[in-house]
Regions:
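Short, low-hydrophobicity acidic/polar segments
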Residues: 1-129, 209, 274, 278-282
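Low-complexity, acidic Ser/Thr/Pro-rich "mucin-like" tracts of secreted and single-pass surface proteins
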Residues: 219-298
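Generic serine detector
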Residues: 13-16, 26, 47, 68, ...
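Residue-level detector of intrinsically disordered, flexible termini
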Residues: 47, 57, 66-69, 135, ...
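Tryptophan-paired
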Residues: 1-46, 112, 119-232
């Protein structure tokens, strides 16, 4: 097998379209419905879970999960290391499967895949504040499905972790870079699996105000200061507009503070366009080369 892209085929009735579940940038292992048992991302692993006549596409999409992150996830932000690529997926309907079948849109254009993660970036534009970086990301899902059939976010409230660089929060997880008019983490974004608002996923950042370093809690809230979901294939940018006062002296105090820290005024912009850049475009579009068909038939 090529080890990068797989297409799983299931036999359909005579009048039905074939549903091609395309998984690109695939991991080398997966978990099925839990965080305990791993399976190889190959025909043997799939065959262990795909029960002929029993397993539906919905079942497979619901249970096909990434490998779980550790608790806590120390110094590890998924898919941010050198050479790591982000899993992506697409569900394509075709009316037949043979040597003439093309993996493309009906107009001949390449398929635009859906990323399995969300992206978060912090930008500081406040003149009275200096963003140092991200210290921790709290209440982060440990796993995510490789593809969602219904578009709903998986209930992972009991399967959470946190990103941090060390146990004492003594160093930054993500360091901000200087940009024109402020600082930004664009060059080192935070990736995470889609997260329900009930998880209360939030960031702890470090910044300088009035000549001193403080910690601030940044919740994922909308314009009405209501918690919101973090969805796959979406980019979230926090823009700090102004600092109203000091934050907290310790990370623990910041973690225990109210969900929306009133010491910072910030805006959250959400980009759900398929074209926002997470990885290079050549990893984002699926062509017909380097693809493997694994056919399951009766």
């Amino acid at each position: 097998l090529a080890g990068k892209r797989y297409v799983i085929l299931t036999k359909q009735s005579n009048d039905s379209e074939y549903q091609l579940l395309i998984l690109a940038n695939s991991p080398d292992r997966f978990y099925y419905g839990d965080a305990v048992t791993e399976y190889g991302f190959d025909e043997t692993g799939f065959s262990a879970q795909l029960m002929q006549g029993l397993t539906t596409l919905a079942d497979f999409c619901t249970n096909m999960l990434t490998a779980p992150l550790a608790v806590p996830s120390v110094s590890v932000i998924p898919y941010s290391g050198n050479g790591q690529v982000i899993p992506m997926s697409y569900l394509l309907e075709v009316d037949k499967i043979d040597h003439t079948t093309k993996i493309e849109n009906t107009d001949g254009t390449p398929l635009m895949l859906t990323r399995a993660i969300a992206k978060m970036v912090i930008v500081n534009k406040a003149t009275n504040f200096e963003l140092k970086g991200v210290v921790a990301v709290m209440n982060v899902p440990r796993q995510g499905p490789l593809h969602t059939l219904d578009g709903l976010i998986r209930d992972n409230t009991s399967n959470l972790t946190e990103y941090r660089n060390d146990a004492a929060y003594s160093s930054l997880l993500v360091q901000a870079d200087f940009i024109d008019g402020g600082e930004s983490t664009e060059n080192d974004p935070v990736y995470l699996y889609e997260s329900d608002m009930r998880n209360n996923t939030h960031l702890i950042i470090q910044g300088a105000y009035g000549g001193r370093d403080y910690f601030y809690k940044m919740a994922i809230v909308n314009k009405d200061v209501q918690l919101m979901d973090l969805q796959r294939n979406h980019s979230y940018q926090f823009t700090i507009v102004t600092a109203k006062g000091p934050g907290y002296d310790t990370v623990e105090d910041a973690k225990a503070s109210k969900p929306s820290n009133t010491a910072l005024d910030y805006e959250i912009s959400v980009d759900n366009r398929d074209s926002y850049e997470v990885v290079a475009n050549n990893d984002f579009f699926l062509g017909v080369s380097n693809s493997v068909f694994i056919a399951y038939t009766s």
